[in-house]
């Protein structure tokens, strides 16, 4: 493998900025602020499709309109789609321009959220749920990949700040879907109305972002900023495997933390409160971690620290003494939010131009989400085989070793690309 470039000279991240980099030419402060707002609002829509479905899953099952095999499909397919469609983002971005692809993805996401709760005549809700979920997964995959390269392109002078804001928005998106979907169901009495609700904020972002995307310069025909094949870069693989182990843990926490706490004897209300606190702490961790990472000479220390916090917090939530469960939840929440944020920040800190950033983002999220989704299946298989979650705690300690190892390697002060 090749493409490993050691960085020389004074720290480019010493103050959370990259010295010598200024806002893009022709971009006024007001335009940059508005663009930053749009990117954050896009982030706020990237997890509601997942968490809103989980919030009313009991009601969907009780309605009898969706068979159990479809429930399994609808809960696991979205994460798989994130991995399958991520590699398409660099191709589309090169052809149409990244902002136009972002806009198109948000249009598709809005369409998916509109289709998902619709009833298709005698076929019922199942076709709409499947088609809508597929559209949402594909659209979110494209946004996941392009957002970091957009930050790299337009906010290279504020990587830490913008990285923190958009990753916090993604964490907040999961919290919004989990927290507001059930109240909408209670108000309307229809789970389909509760799911349909989330098309409104997505449509609002489309209207807000459309003028920015339409006025953005088109990608130059045949433009290829030359050179770096991220799939042959050792640094790119270190970053990708760091993302993979992060994703295995994060998606497992998202899917299984509440059932794990319930099985340990914690009542439903308390388990829900613990999950909510964990999500709030994730937001806090994701807000500050990118800025801290960008200010460091290299990121080995922060990568290892947050990987240890996450794996220990999750394992102890499964295996540790219950009298300290709030400590384990706090450790997990802060660690997981920071781990997700620094993994995504590696895209910007390990590349020198937006072209390489979008290719690295497609690689690490394609592999990371595609393979990382197996984490939820590992937990399910362990529980189905043993009847309990205890073995999963040991499994995620082993996964934590992988996150620590590749977090250390990804954190070394090297770039994927030598150009730029």
Residue ranges of predicted features:
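A late C-terminal transmembrane helix in Major Facilitator Superfamily
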Residues: 354-390, 396
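Cytoplasmic helix-loop-helix junction between adjacent transmembrane helices
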Residues: 132-168
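Extracytoplasmic
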Residues: 34-68, 86-89, 144, 253-258, ...
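Extracytoplasmic gate region of multi-pass secondary transporters
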Residues: 53-54, 234-286
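C-terminal transmembrane helical hairpin of 12-TM major facilitator-type secondary transporters
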Residues: 299-343
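Residue-level signature of mid-helix packing/kink "hotspots" within the transmembrane helices
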Residues: 51, 79-87, 174-175, 279-287, ...
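Helix-loop-helix hairpin linking two adjacent transmembrane segments in secondary transporters
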Residues: 157-158, 164-214
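Conserved MFS/SLC helix-loop-helix module at the cytosolic interface between two early adjacent transmembrane helices
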Residues: 84-126
């Amino acid at each position: 493998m090749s493409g490993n470039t050691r960085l020389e000279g004074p720290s480019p991240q010493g103050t959370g900025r990259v010295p010598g980099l200024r806002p893009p030419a022709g971009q006024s402060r007001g335009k940059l602020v508005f663009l930053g707002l749009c990117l954050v609002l896009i982030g706020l829509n990237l997890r509601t499709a997942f968490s809103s479905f989980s919030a009313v899953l009991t009601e969907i099952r009780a309605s009898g309109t969706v068979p159990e095999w479809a429930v399994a499909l609808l809960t696991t397919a979205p994460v798989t789609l994130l991995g399958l469609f991520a590699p398409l983002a660099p191709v589309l971005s090169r052809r149409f321009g990244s902002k136009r692809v972002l806009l198109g993805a948000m249009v598709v996401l809005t369409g998916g959220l509109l289709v998902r709760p619709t009833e298709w005549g005698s076929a019922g809700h199942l076709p709409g749920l499947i088609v809508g979920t597929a559209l949402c997964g594909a659209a979110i995959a494209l946004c996941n990949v392009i957002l970091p390269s957009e930050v790299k392109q337009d906010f290279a002078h504020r990587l830490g700040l913008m990285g923190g804001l958009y990753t916090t928005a993604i964490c907040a998106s999961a919290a919004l879907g989990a927290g507001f979907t059930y109240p909408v169901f209670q108000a309307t009495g229809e789970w389909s109305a509760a799911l349909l609700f989330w098309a409104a904020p997505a449509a609002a972002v489309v209207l807000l972002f459309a003028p920015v995307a339409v006025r953005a310069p088109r990608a130059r025909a045949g433009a290829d900023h030359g050179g770096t094949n991220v799939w042959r870069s050792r640094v790119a693989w270190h970053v990708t495997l760091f993302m993979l182990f992060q994703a295995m843990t994060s998606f497992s926490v998202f899917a299984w933390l509440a059932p794990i706490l319930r099985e340990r004897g914690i009542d439903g209300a308390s388990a829900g409160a613990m999950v909510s606190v964990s999500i709030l702490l994730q937001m806090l961790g994701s807000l500050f971690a990118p800025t801290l990472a960008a200010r460091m000479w290299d990121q080995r220390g922060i990568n290892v620290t947050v990987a240890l916090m996450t794996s220990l917090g999750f394992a102890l939530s499964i295996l540790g003494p219950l009298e300290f469960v709030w400590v384990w939840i706090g450790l997990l929440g802060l660690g997981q939010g920071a781990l997700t944020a620094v993994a995504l920040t590696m895209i910007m800190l390990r590349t020198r131009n937006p072209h390489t950033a979008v290719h690295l983002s497609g690689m690490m999220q394609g592999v990371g989400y595609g393979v990382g989704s197996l984490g939820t299946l590992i937990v399910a298989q362990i529980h189905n085989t043993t009847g309990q979650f205890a073995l999963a705690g040991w499994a995620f300690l082993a996964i934590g070793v992988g996150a620590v190892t590749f977090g250390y390697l990804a954190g070394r002060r090297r770039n994927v690309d030598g150009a730029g």
